[in-house]
């Protein structure tokens, strides 16, 4: 599955547009990791626990979007974008959306 943020794929032509596909995940913070994050906020630096959590969330949301696209017969997804939103205190949603298409070599 080709997944790109651009509106086209070099060397490919879009032969069919299938529509919007999406994948999301909602993650809650972990109290133990929050304690480590508080210390990082005091001394500065990257909060690796949150970086890892966001990376895992992004991969899961992308995998779910790909499954959505495969179910409708797509072999590529274009115009992919991500967004996050706060669901509740301590929980956030990561949403990935794109346009499912069928592409062929030019």
Question: What are the residue ranges of the model-derived segments?
Answer:
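Short, well-ordered alpha-helical segments
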Residues: 21, 26, 34-81
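Membrane-proximal amphipathic alpha-helices
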Residues: 88, 92-93
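N-terminal presequence-like segments and the immediate start of the first folded domain
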Residues: 1-33, 71, 94-106
């Amino acid at each position: 599955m080709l997944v790109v943020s651009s509106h086209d794929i070099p060397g490919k032509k879009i032969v069919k547009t299938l529509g919007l596909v999406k994948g999301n995940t909602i993650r809650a913070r972990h109290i133990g990791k929050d304690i480590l994050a508080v210390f990082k906020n005091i001394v500065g630096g990257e909060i690796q626990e949150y970086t890892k959590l966001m990376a895992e969330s992004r991969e899961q949301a992308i995998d779910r979007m790909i499954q959505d696209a495969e179910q409708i017969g797509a072999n590529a997804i274009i115009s992919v974008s991500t967004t996050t939103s706060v669901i509740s205190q301590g929980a956030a949603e990561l949403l990935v959306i794109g346009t499912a298409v069928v592409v062929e070599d030019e």
